[in-house]
Amino acid sequence: MKKKMNKGICLLLAATMLTVGATGCGSGGSDMEEDKNLVSEDTDVAENARNSTDETSQDTENTDKEKDTEPQSSVSEAPDIEGLTFESEMSLTYAECFHVYYYNDGYKLLDVPESGSYLIVPEGKEAPEGLDENVKILQQPLKKIYLAATSAMALFDAIDEIGSIRFSGTQVNGWYIDSAVQAMENGDIIYAGKYSEPDYELLVDEGCDLAIESTMILHTPKVQEMIEMLDIPVFIDRSSYETHPLGRTEWIKAYGAMLNKEAEAETFFEDQAQIIEELKDFENTGKTVAIFYMNTNGVAVVRKPSDYMAKMVEIAGAKYAFSDVIDDSTGTTMDMTMEEFYSAAVDADYLIYNASIDNSVTSMDALLAKSDLFTDFKAIKEGNVWTTGKSLYQATDIVGQLIRDVNLMITDGDESEMTFLTRLQ
């Protein structure tokens, strides 16, 4: 099917596809409300929880923390592609959720387990005959991308490729990245509907060449199918599945491969890795930190011990309050009744309320209104409750700043130097 199809056919297909069946649910579960465009897809991930155990001494805690921050080189086996010769694999240090394989004549295979394989075809060349039908083709140059995965925008910006994005799944007032805001205000990037309700006609008329989605798209499989029927490949970003904060940042290399900006991506990543390397020497304070928000059902939603935000807390020199909690469900967050949350976090030294998910808590009174049980919490009694900024999940490129913030928080550092955290009054 050609992209420049008749508008009537496009609209008819869209109407047909979206009325065939009810919205589906994929493997990427989410605790986030679908209509909150200001929130990144970061809470919509599915990964196995890693169970943690108490360290017996401060020395042991520091040793384990250092081990957890050590880079783990990712190596895999390159797929055979008929007509192409494998040459090398991209070196990855922390990322575990994608691989890039290089073949002759500039061909690349971007493999994202559980999402798909994508053959990047150089400009002026064609995909080899006999290519596995499950391999999606990304034809360079990619200059009219529909970006529905908000966490990727900062990575595009870091390699100076916001110009490759033509369509946004977030409205201008939902962006906290200056370059994205400016591009939308200038008309260089246009709003094309959120991930679950894209403007198909606009994407076709403007010649969209790639849709980059978060795993939220798995909740609306008919939408993904419709986009692909319009001959627009769908790439699903799984950076939120990474268990190390730098694994998430290292996804800049995946986008660098798409846009032939590997060198720029490597340079940027190494700079960020150096920042984390310097931060990992923070002394373990023994302080405990809980990260959570309350959903509309009065349930506490917390980050699992395997989540990269829990890892940030450890690198910053604290212990994650839920490190001993075992949860076998999918997702990097887990639901806890208020009673369960009370049991696990009542004695936590610090509470961090995730305002990028729920921004209703703007004062201590607003938090106390969520449950009477909060009055017993140590952190609330001592005034050690903090909130994150709304921009947190879009800041994929500066993960070290949150680690610094947490360290400043637990060491009574200068609050004016914080980027994301604000003390709740």
Predicted regions and their residues:
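Bacterial N-terminal signal peptides that target proteins for export
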Residues: K2-L12
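A short, structured surface patch at a secondary-structure boundary
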Residues: K108-V204, L210-I217
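C-terminal motif of bacterial Sec signal peptides marking the signal peptidase cleavage site
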Residues: V20-G24
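Extracytoplasmic ligand-binding site segments that recognize negatively charged/polar headgroups
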Residues: K143, T150-E161, S168-S179, H219-K222, ...
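Bacterial Sec-exported substrate-binding components of ABC uptake systems
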Residues: C25-M153, E264-I291, D414-Q425
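Soluble non-cytosolic domains of exported or imported proteins
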Residues: Q139, G193-P198, S214-P221, E242-T249, ...
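Flexible, glycine-rich surface segments
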Residues: I275, D281-T362
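Structured C-terminal subdomain patch of bacterial secreted/periplasmic proteins
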Residues: S73-V75, E242-D271, D347-Q425
